[in-house]
Amino acid sequence: MTFPRALTVIDDNGMVINIIFWFLLIIILILLSIALLNIIKLCMVCCNLGRTVIIVPAQHAYDAYKNFMRIKAYNPDGALLA
């Protein structure tokens, strides 16, 4: 099957269409890579936010609890016998 000659502007055996499709493919790949990088940045921001909002305050509360519950060791010389 041959392409009608009346619709042929330049007889380049599909080179122009091939170049257009390659440029479209490259543009789509660039857009997908930009979207992937933005998703990775979003994950990093969420991890940092979770660390700042949840983990660090819980760690400070646990450290305060440990300091509050610290009991001095038994010293038999310092004990008072009644």
UniProtKB/Swiss-Prot annotation:
UniProt membrane topology term: Single-pass type III membrane protein
One Pfam short name: CoV_E
Location of this chain's protein in the cell: Host Golgi apparatus membrane
Biological processes annotated in GO: disruption of cellular anatomical structure in another organism; viral budding from Golgi membrane
Membrane-traversing stretches: 20-40
Membrane-side (Intravirion) residue stretches: 41-82
Virion surface side: 1-19
Keywords (A to Z) from UniProt: Apoptosis, Host Golgi apparatus, Host membrane, Membrane, Transmembrane, Transmembrane helix
Cellular component, GO, one term: membrane
Family of this protein: Belongs to the alphacoronaviruses E protein family.
Functional description taken from the UniProt entry: Plays a central role in virus morphogenesis and assembly. Acts as a viroporin and self-assembles in host membranes forming pentameric protein-lipid pores that allow ion transport. Also plays a role in the induction of apoptosis.
Oligomer status and interactors: Homopentamer. Interacts with membrane protein M in the budding compartment of the host cell, which is located between endoplasmic reticulum and the Golgi complex. Interacts with Nucleoprotein.
UniProt protein name: Envelope small membrane protein
